[in-house]
Amino acid sequence: MTQVESWRKVYSDVVGEKVSLDLNIFSDNYDEIIFFGCGSSYNLSQSASFFTKSLLDGRSCFTLPSSELLINTDIYINKDKKYLIVGFSRSGETTESINVVKLLKDRQNVTSFTFSCKEGSTISKFSDYHFICKGAAEKSIVMTVSFSSMLIAYCLMLTKLLNNKDMLNEFKNLSNYLGENISKLFDDVEYYIDKNNFSSYFVVGSGFNYGLAVEADLKMKEMSQTPSYSYHLYEFNHGPKSLINKESLCLILTLSKSLFKTEEIIKEILNLGSKVLLVGSKDISIVDSKNIDYLLSDSNFKFDIIKSFINIPIFQILAYIKTIKKNLNPDKPKNLDYTMVI
């Protein structure tokens, strides 16, 4: 299943109520919501956590790698508080994530809600609530469609619970926009890589985009074996910029109107010799340089947090094409397995 097809199916399942969902799970008065996962699933957890804070008026929530929650359980789980733990695992068979749910299953103050892409998974059997993104589990070791599908499924559920019809409609438009542009996007990215070789890769993003930046870094690193790094937008100036040179590419994820002095940051990156690739509209940050290019510059979304989803196919395609150009197999990265079982 392609990314566009998967997003449309998830939308139909969640918003069209083709799958039975008990959205009251979000309505309970939890003291904290903890998101967890491993690898790419941990990265999407960071964005899911920010989305939750944004829609639930700063509800207390945070993100942990599954292993951290597993080995330091009593530090993060207080017996006097009520928790919702939300976990993500493509296969539903990742050892650390399963063990988190099993460990906390009998605690009366903890409710678990997990997402996976395969039916009958072990994690679903131990979870209080579970959602399956059917058809989103790619055969490749690398998570692409499954990553975005689980993230968009969670975000749609929360949006539906709040009955935010404007956001739900924009999520629908998101799938249509991607469907109209995906073929051209492949061509544009390949053309860009052919014209702009790079040996190091930086991705910066703030808020919801930080989790995506870490995932973009991971995709390039694991697939193409290119040294890659990810940072919050404004943290990039506090040390990491020392690594930039003329052989670098800096991918700047979609900018929101709430950000400040982005032009200065972009200009400094350019002055250090790096090439810059910016996702989204030019009207937010106008910088004139032969070393800056834009992708999906015609994108126009009312909600910045939904616009952020257009970053995902871009950084996945960038990593894929870079890998192909280096004569590596994008589906079987070095030293990696489909599911981590310990």
What residue spans do the PLM features occupy?
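Glycine-rich phosphate-binding loops that contact phosphosugars or nucleotide phosphates
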Residues: 28-175, 206, 241, 249-301, ...
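Active-site phosphate/pyrophosphate-binding segments
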Residues: 8-29, 129-251, 259, 326-342
